[in-house]
Amino acid sequence: MVNESLNQEESNDRPVPESEFQADTSYSTQPSVSIHPSVSGHPSVSIHPSVSGHPSVSIDPSVSVHPSSSAHPSTLAQPSGLTHPNELVKEDSVIKVSKRRWAVVLVFSCYSLCNAFQWIQYGSINNIFMNFYGVSAFAIDWLSMCYMLTYIPLLLPVAWMLEKFGLRTIAITGSALNCLGAWVKLGSLEPHLFPVTMVGQVICSVAQVFILGMPSRIASVWFGANEVSTACSMAVFGNQLGIAIGFLVPPVLVPNIKDQEKLAYHISIMFYIIGGVATLLFILVIIVFKEKPKYPPSRAQSLSYALATTDASYLSSIVRLFKNLNFVLLVITYGLNAGAFYALSTLLNRMVIMHFPGQEVNAGRIGLTIVIAGMFGAMISGIWLDKSKTYKETTLVVYIMTLVGMVVYTFTLNLNHLWIVFITADSLGFFMTGYLPLGFEFAVELTYPESEGVSSGLLNVSAQVFGIIFTISQGQIIDNYGSVPGNIFLCVFLALGSALTAFIKSDLRRQRANKDAPETKVQEEEEEEEESNTSKVPTVLSEAHL
């Protein structure tokens, strides 16, 4: 390609679609053609000095332009990065998916797993840390709730950073903070050092802000139109698996013993393991993460490149989102469901120990059952959405079944049969945890082409707010009245969420963007392949696509 810097005074010339340029047969395709005898140039192409256009114009070296051509000068090339949206969805647009996308979503899932483990590692053995640090149950609850509290004020700055600096910067920052927080906790292995473990947990909670809004963004930027829901489910899958491991591993690594020195030793093993894993994942993020693939993976993503502008008002995007009634309803309903899950996860150990004293390990296994079942629910619902596109219907059914599962769990917990609790926890988790990625994807559909980082961030703020309210309220109800009234409290709000979900309209804007454009075969990108075919005019891509 030959890049010519042309006169700026004609920079406002209308950019003509590449199809016009290729169709004009008055342009010679013979190499080494001189355009005007008085003008000399590159051996393979000469350009008359009167031809002007936008800066950084890409011109195929095999094309020469005769001054007598009747075409407008701006048809000679497509300005770099200044393509109209309707031109981006023409038939010859390059739409490819990158093989790297699987590595990106896998690494993200792993460090999201690590961060989620650190969130629940205290709550899953609440009574053991109470005895070790000599603090109240409410103080240990704050090791969980600090994740929720930190997210609320930091959402908008981090979402702005995601738009400003992109996926790679946010991923590196989140994994670095996650690693730092894990190592800080190693300085809290004495009973009087509870403030140090709180500082480490707060650092990890800040890392979470750089993680929770990423799944839908990664899915949209890296995956094709028929993969986005599955990819989003895979990204959320890591966070859920981290919670599952956080329920299972701490009760095994840290037994309920009275000897403080031995207890400190067991806690240190857990902290060292998580510190080493967090460090390894930080290195992998640096190696694997790229800002975006070489080519857009879908027409909707290609169009979003065109609509994105550097001077776009970030606050105006948020204002537009809150004017979208369907999205506002989803924010509320998502917060109610996810907030109930956060409260249930935080207080699960306390509820199980109340009915089954000395069963810390089984309390962790019940939590594991809830999350593992939810992971299967998330994957199944993600695959179903990619096939059926029934976002509203699927979300509503899953929400109602979450309510049913919570009611059954509530009234079987006090039957004093542990195997029944495992069964009801499994059914509850399948729908309650499986709902989380549905909310992300439904939000992107309702708000397209607004930023996925902003929409998913607002969903998470709602989840954190309701999570704090529900955790504190249910904790007080359990302490004063028992587990059944505490769980009924959550059932009431899940019923409200189910009713509100029914009023959300199925306005699938991203699906319309993909369907409105002509079909293009999505190819698998061969990243190592060099573009060696210069015998024909290639599709011109703006620099934003590379």
UniProtKB/Swiss-Prot annotation:
The modification Phosphoserine is found at S535. Keywords: Cell membrane, Endoplasmic reticulum, Membrane, Mitochondrion, Phosphoprotein, Repeat, Transmembrane, Transmembrane helix, Transport. Residues 54-74 have a biased composition (Low complexity). Choline binds at N115, A116, W119, L212, Y342, Q464. GO terms for cellular component: endoplasmic reticulum membrane; membrane; mitochondrial membrane; plasma membrane. Sequence repeats lie at residues 31-36, 37-42, 43-48, 49-54, 55-60, 61-66, 67-72, 73-78, 79-84. This is Choline/ethanolamine transporter FLVCR2. The gene is Flvcr2.
